[in-house]
UniProtKB/Swiss-Prot annotation:
Residues 177-335, 394-551 form the Cupin type-1 domain. The gene is BETA6. The variability of the residues taking part of IgE-binding epitopes might be responsible of the difference in cross-reactivity among legumes. Residues 38-105, 147-158, 349-365 have a biased composition (Basic and acidic residues). It comes from Lupinus angustifolius (Narrow-leaved blue lupine). The keyword Signal applies. Seed storage protein. Accumulates during seed development and is hydrolyzed after germination to provide a carbon and nitrogen source for the developing seedling. PANTHER family: OS03G0336100 PROTEIN-RELATED, VICILIN C72. Residues 1-30 form the signal peptide. This is Conglutin beta 6. Pfam families: Cupin_1 (PF00190). Keywords: Allergen, Glycoprotein, Seed storage protein, Signal, Storage protein. Residues 38-178, 343-365, 377-399 are annotated as: Disordered. CDD domains: cupin_7S_vicilin-like_C (cd02245), cupin_7S_vicilin-like_N (cd02244).
Length: 593
């Protein structure tokens, strides 16, 4: 046990000596490799290029190791100098490393700083623009009004672009006062014509709630056709917009027929049985009616005595016993003659072939020329001069226009001038605007106008309030506009300023509702201009400019009611442009000749 204790320290000492020798040998071998690599770089590169070289034998490696030791002993005097140089080089390298680390740490910061400097102007640009805009807005009250107006113009232009690119549903939400011709719903249609009705006004917006009991109906028929007799639970005011017609009104004690031409109008009381003939051989008939339902607001029904594929006879709603007692005839006979019998014999079909074909056609049927002549034999023409009668038709252009100049004509029949429209409180207007002309801005004091495009194309601008539920000081003005074409309809609420621009010869038909004592107030023009009638002092207090400047501006427009839609400045620029081009051409010709 004592011997083991003595040998253990000795063993540890020997192991330490061996470890130190191994370390010294490894260091010497590493330095030898460094020297060898400096002296023989070509051999090293060759070894790296050929990694597939076979490993050398162990005794050969031992010989090479001995050879290296001998060379190291031969170079022993210069080894100290080399080690000192290497130590100095290591010190220099140690001093360089902290500097490199600092540079590497600073390099990303410089990159980020450069990126921040690069992005900083971009962030500052909007801020500088806002500051400049605020400075410009703060320069004067007029510039503030102008910038607010420009912002509103830009917003409304974006809304109009979205309106033109969107579908009809989204467009309806932005402009509830405009109804395209696609908003009509077809009631009846066959090869001879069609009857359709516009959707309800109050379904579009609450702002048209007062129009819930008014509907627009349109029917068209081909030449030599007849719309079968019917009556309705609504009052009608009908207007012929295209072609000619013969309408027959049937009362319990008499029957009256009238020949109607383009522009003729007629009141058709509720419950009156009537039928309309298109007697022309070539021209289609187009009639528009304003319907005022009696029983249910916004809903009306047509009642036909005949049965066809489109509707049933109102006789079919009675019981068999009631019909037999009413006509004092067997039910089978009533069914065969009035209602139609599906079990008719073949000889009966041949005998009544014409009546059967009319049932197959529907509501609008064809008639022969002989039948046309018979139906028009006792018809009267409309009254084109003098006061309208209490029951007969009247023409919208029978009297002189109330507004007229070289740019357009404005015809109107008011309730106090027409007994047929007096109890309905309806007025009728017919407007003709020449191509390139403008109906100057105006508003109606109490009447709501429903306007239909009869012919041509144009556009309108209606000024309203964006949110009518806000307080007065928070209300914001909005412009509602739309491109108009034939068949389109738009509504002009009372008090809302409007202007209409014609891009082609434009014809409009208007129904004025709540029209009694309505007054039309123009906002520009020489006559009937309410702005012109303001006191001079009030003009200066109302507008940003001085009173004399306001008066001079108002007097610039010498026309009344209708004017040229092209601004005077633009016309002058175009004239100058044409004159400039002409002078340029003359100068070129003068150099040539």
């Amino acid at each position: 046990m004592i011997k083991m204790r003595v040998r253990f320290p000795t063993l540890v000492l020997l192991l330490g000596i061996v470890f130190l020798m191994a370390v010294s040998i490894g260091i010497a071998y590493g330095e030898k490799n460094v020297i060898k690599n400096h002296e023989r770089p070509q051999e090293r590169e060759q070894e790296e290029r050929d990694p597939r070289q076979q490993p050398r034998p162990h005794h050969q490696e031992e010989q090479e190791r001995e050879h290296r030791r001998e060379e190291e002993r031969d170079r022993e005097p210069s080894r100290g100098r080399r080690e000192s140089e290497e130590s100095r080089e290591e010190e220099r390298e140690q001093r360089r490393e902290p500097r490199r680390e600092r540079e590497q740490e600073q390099q990303p910061q410089h990159g980020r700083r450069e990126e921040e400097e690069e992005w900083q102007p971009r962030r500052q640009r909007p801020q500088s623009r806002r500051e400049e805009r605020e400075q410009e807005q703060g320069s004067s009250s007029s510039s503030r009004r102008q910038s607010a107006y420009e912002r509103r113009e830009q917003r409304e232009e974006r809304e109009q672009e979205q309106e033109q690119g969107s579908r009809s549903d989204s467009r309806r939400q932005r402009n509830p006062y405009y109804f395209s011709s696609e908003r009509f719903q077809t009631l009846y249609r066959n090869r001879n014509g069609q009857i359709r009705v516009l959707e309800r006004f109050d379904k579009r917006t609450d702002r048209l709630e007062n129009l819930q009991n008014y509907r627009i109906v349109e029917f068209q028929s081909k030449p030599n056709t007849l719309i079968l007799p019917k009556h309705s639970d609504a009052d009608y005011i009908l207007v012929v917009l295209n072609g000619s017609a013969t309408i027959t009104i049937v009362n319990p004690d008499k029957r009256q027929s009238y020949n109607l031409e383009n522009g003729d109008a007629l009141r058709l009381p509720a419950g009156t049985t009537s039928y309309i003939l298109n007697p022309d051989d070539n021209q289609n008939l187009r009639v528009v009616k304003l319907a005022i339902p009696i029983n249910n607001p916004g809903n009306f029904y047509d009642f036909y005595p005949s049965s066809s594929k489109d509707q049933q006879s109102y006789f079919s709603g009675f019981s068999r016993n009631t019909l037999e007692a009413t006509f004092n005839t067997r039910y089978e006979e009533i069914q065969r003659i009035l209602l139609g019998n599906e079990d008719e014999q073949e000889d009966d079909e041949q005998r009544h072939g014409q009546e059967q074909s009319h049932q197959d056609e529907g509501v609008i049927v064809r008639v022969s020329k002989e039948q046309v002549q018979e139906l028009r034999k006792y018809a009267q023409s409309s009254s084109r001069k003098g006061k309208p009668s209490k029951s007969g038709p009247f023409n919208l252009r029978s009297n002189k226009p109330i507004y007229s100049n070289k740019f357009g004509n404005f015809y109107e029949i008011t309730p106090n001038r027409n007994p047929q429209a007096q109890d309905l409180d309806i007025s009728l207007t017919f407007i003709e605007i020449n191509e390139g002309a403008l109906l100057l801005p105006h508003y109606n004091s109490k009447a709501i106008f429903v306007v239909l495009v009869d012919e041509g194309e144009g556009n309108y601008e209606l000024v309203g309030i964006r949110d009518q539920q806000r307080q007065q000081d928070e209300q914001e003005v909005r412009r509602y506009s739309a491109r108009l074409s034939e068949g389109d309809i738009f509504v002009i609420p009372a008090g809302h300023p409007i202007s209409i621009n014609a891009s082609s010869n434009f014809r409009l038909l208007g129904f004025g509702i709540n029209a009694d004592e309505n007054q039309r107030n123009f906002l520009a023009g020489f006559e009937d201009n309410v702005i012109r009638q303001l006191d001079r002092e009030v003009k200066g207090l109302t507008f940003p400019g001085f009173a004399e400047d306001v008066e001079r501006l108002i007097k610039n427009q010498q026309q009344s009611y209708f004017a040229n839609a092209q601004p005077q400045q633009q016309q002058q620029r175009e004239r100058e442009g044409r004159h400039g081009r002409r002078g340029h051409i003359f100068s070129i010709l003068s150099t040539l000749y």
